[in-house]
Amino acid sequence: MLDIPLSESLQHPGTRVAVNIIISIAAIALVRVIGSRWLTQYHLRALPLVNGLGLFESGKRAKGSFLFNAQGLLDEGYAKSSKAFRVQTDSEQVVVLAPECASEIRNDDRFSFTNLLAEDFLAHIPAFVNFSPHNGLNDMANDVITKKLNPALGLVTPDLSAEATLTFRDHWTDSTEWHSVNVKGTILEIVARLSSRVFLGPELCRNPAWLRITVDYTTNLFFGVVALKKWRSFLHPLVWRFVPEVRKVRQQIEEAIQLIQPVVDKRHAESRSSAASSGKKDQTLYDLCSYPEYIEPLRDELVTVLKESGMTKAGLFKLKLMDSFMKESQRFKPGAMIMMRRKVMEDVTLSNGVFLPRGVQVGIPLRSHFNPKAYSDPDKFDGYRYVKMADDPEKEVFRHFVTTSQEHMGFGFGKHSCPGRFFAANEVKVALCHILLKYDFKLAEGPKPNVMKMGWVLISDPMTNLMIKRREGIDESILE
């Protein structure tokens, strides 16, 4: 091998050309990135930025105000503009649109949900590659849910109820004495078992290692993304391997594959030889404790309906008061402050005159959940609200828990509404039937549950405990 000094090699004409080309390409790429961002900000300059920075301020203040005071930023933005305004999040500027824009963008292909997820969850990082719009996983999951799971809800409902009997016995016990349980912790474990019973069957739904991953993965994913976003974006590909929260996510994915693969192999062999909600459950429980006057009417309804129709998909559909209570609970306390988050894939001018340049993120606030034009006395919790809509032909279609609309976007709205909401609704109802029929419950002494806020995300209080005891002298056969 020739040992040519670096100084001499750089004098070679071919080397100088190669270096110049590399520098030119890097410079062009840098100019394009900076230019694109500058152009985007130039086009958005007409929209108020509620947590903008002063000349000598760092981005930490803006990010901190978003993470810990997002609702205050939304209120400030509403006061400044009724059409649209900007919020600096922990990673990007998001344009918050007026609620009436929901119908306009809901089915517009220029507003991409999958590309938003990829950008939000850093899909270019191997630990988060599941969110990439290019690997087909999103399309596959949607197909499984819409084409396989939703049509089979009638078949899986008995399995859900049977597993609910076992998991409530394990986590809430059969004790007839008052005792305390942590709502968030036990409900997460119960949801994990019920969902795993449907998606994976009995082989894994009671496996402690699998249930631990199922319970912890979403939380670890969230904190992994937040931790990596503390670094400059150009450093993400270099530092992700050394961020403990991100490494934990990658490790859990590998553990999950090791647990699932033997089950998949077994089912493939069987096939050759013979030719898948938690936040909704705990928040609903908190609301039942806050409004205990609904407990007996709900019990009376489920006993009447299940005696007549059994624990079936049809029987669950007939639980009108339960459905209404769940929807009202979600109206008051959804999972986020804004919904219908999208990435704009090409320049768009909305009907209200707001111009959105390609590449910007947008979202719709949930102020419509408290719109007096849509709801009478909107600031009052009314568990019968959607039952009453059955008497209004114009509103009847919107009363169901799984129905989305501009006035109720708990599951989103439009073509990207949550495809798993039908299964989630059935799962929540099965669990509530078991809870209402089998247990007396009340909030433990102490502070009332508070909704925790982290950026846009709303999380039911993880520290809240319930006092529960098993009811006696009841007919449990209606749950079979």
Curated annotation (Swiss-Prot):
It is found in: Membrane. It comes from the Eukaryota. It is a single-pass membrane protein. Pathway: Secondary metabolite biosynthesis; terpenoid biosynthesis. It is an enzyme of class 1 (oxidoreductase). It holds the Pfam family p450. Its cofactor is heme. Heme binds at C418. The chain crosses the membrane at residues 17-34. Keywords: Heme, Iron, Membrane, Metal-binding, Monooxygenase, Oxidoreductase, Transmembrane, Transmembrane helix. GO terms for cellular component: membrane. CDD domains: CYP503A1-like. Its EC number is 1.-.-.-. One of its GO terms (molecular function) is heme binding. Belongs to the cytochrome P450 family. Cytochrome P450 monooxygenase; part of the gene cluster that mediates the biosynthesis of the meroterpenoids arthripenoids. The pathway begins with the HR-PKS atnH that catalyzes two chain-extension steps to form a reduced triketide, which then primes the SAT domain in the NR-PKS atnG to initiate three more cycles of extension to give a linear hexaketide corresponding to the polyketide part of arthripenoids. This is Cytochrome P450 monooxygenase atnM. It comes from Arthrinium sp. The lineage of its organism: Eukaryota, Fungi, Dikarya, Ascomycota, Pezizomycotina.
